[in-house]
Structures are given as structure tokens and as C-alpha cells.
Design a protein with these regions (language model features):
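Immediate N-terminus of the mature polypeptide
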Residues: 1-242
């Protein structure tokens, strides 16, 4: 910051050259770092990992560290059950990179969730939510989206739905599923489940959706569109065990 650039042109016969001279001044460093977090749950999670923050007193001011910190906190909260958290709830304020003492304070604010109902925007406390119901829809297709599922199998807390007779053995199938009943919401488990189901190469589409039951519980739906050539079923050897 606060660098000076001097531009000069050297004119000669049939030739001209230009040069830039950049003078770097003293960089800005972080001074006090204050935090204002609306949610007690989120505040507790933040404090438990503050030692890993990219923003530390005495460190040089860098834009990229603010982006890294926002990404770190978003991943932390969304893998600790805070399903409704999004990066735009994090804001950084009171930053002055032109301060004469080359130090800047930082105020980080993390707000509660904002929701809209009937045109009114309200603030709702962020909560840790658990997954209480998991449905696996094994043969979804747009052409049959309005049809009722004829076959339903319940196994170990999961409900399997199929338009025709279920072609998969639930116990074997679940080796590729890392989302479990009673588990807190985690982005990592959602991504891992999607990855392993795609690795089976049985399904053309893999979608994982969540729906809020109440402020403490979520339901999860694993929606699968099979490839025709794999309509017979899943080979046990193709499953990656968890």
C-alpha cells in the first residue's frame, strides 16, 4: 500500500523507451483484532480454533488472508452442524491501510441468519442441526417424478424408495453413504457421499438435498438416476467401504 510510481520517457532518434520506477513504502500490519459474533454456538466454535486464524496481531496486512479466513470459518461452521451458515454472514470492518503508524485494527462481525417470510426479514439464531431422517430414492427420473414409489425398504435408519422392485441390497449400498441418522450436518460427509456414489458409475445423476424439519433437525434425500446399463444392480466389489 501507499506506493509511489514514477513514469519517464527517454526520447531518441527513431526510438523511444519508457520506464517505471516504483518506490515501496512501509507495509501495514494488523494491530488489535476484535470479534463480534451474534450466535453463542458460532462464537464458541470460533474461539476453539482461533489459534489457526489467518488474521493474527502483528502479521502483515494481506487481502488474501481475509479471504482465507472467511473460507476457513465457513468450512469450520458448516462441518460442525451449522447448516444455514453462509460466507456472506462474515464481514470485516474498521480497516485503515493508510494509517500513519502503519497499523490497522480489524473488527470481524458474524451475523445470525436472515430469513424472509411474507415480505418481512427477520434474524434467526444459528443452530447446530442433526439429520434425523434419510431417504434414498434409487430410480428417480423426470418422466416419473409425479408417480408414487411402489417399493419401500427400511434398513438401519434409512428408507429406500423405488418405483419398481428395489434392485440394491441396502447393507452393501450403504458402504458408499457417509451421511448417517443422528449425525450433525457436515458438508464433508455430503461431498464424500456424492463422490463415492459417482465412483460406482451406476448413476447418471446424484443429488443430495436437505430440508429443515425444525431448528434442530434436518431430513436428507439422496436422489439417484441410474444408468440403463447398470439397471441390474450394484456389484459388491464396486463398493468402497467406509
Amino acid at each position: 500500500f501507499n506506493a509511489e510510481v514514477v513514469y519517464s520517457i527517454d526520447l531518441k532518434v527513431k526510438k523511444a523507451s519508457s520506464s517505471y520506477h516504483i518506490t515501496k513504502h512501509q507495509p501495514t500490519f494488523l494491530d488489535s483484532i476484535k470479534v463480534a459474533i451474534d450466535s453463542k454456538i458460532v462464537d464458541s466454535l470460533y474461539k476453539s480454533t482461533v489459534a489457526h486464524s489467518f488474521l493474527q496481531k502483528g502479521k502483515r496486512y494481506r487481502d488474501e488472508n481475509f479471504r482465507k479466513e472467511a473460507n476457513r470459518l465457513t468450512a469450520l461452521f458448516r462441518n460442525a452442524g451449522v447448516y444455514h451458515f453462509s460466507k456472506n454472514q462474515i464481514g470485516f470492518y474498521e480497516i485503515d491501510t493508510l494509517a500513519p503508524n502503519h497499523k490497522t485494527n480489524v473488527l470481524m462481525k458474524i451475523t445470525d441468519r436472515l430469513s424472509e417470510k411474507e415480505g418481512t426479514i427477520t434474524s434467526q439464531p444459528l443452530q447446530v442441526q442433526k439429520i434425523s431422517k434419510i431417504g434414498v430414492f434409487t430410480d428417480y427420473s423426470y418422466a416419473r417424478k409425479d408417480e408414487l414409489y411402489r417399493d419401500t425398504v427400511h434398513y438401519d435408519g434409512y428408507a429406500f424408495f423405488s418405483h419398481d422392485k428395489l434392485k440394491y441390497r441396502p447393507k452393501t449400498f450403504l458402504n458408499a453413504v457417509f451421511i448417517e441418522p443422528g449425525q450433525i450436518y457436515k458438508d464433508s460427509m455430503r461431498n464424500l457421499t456424492r463422490k463415492h456414489l459417482k465412483l460406482l458409475k451406476n448413476f447418471k445423476l446424484v443429488k443430495i438435498r436437505y430440508k429443515e424439519i425444525n431448528d434442530k433437525e434436518l431430513s436428507a434425500s439422496i436422489v439417484l438416476t441410474p444408468m440403463k446399463k447398470y439397471a441390474i444392480g450394484i456389484n459388491t466389489e464396486a463398493i468402497h467401504s467406509n
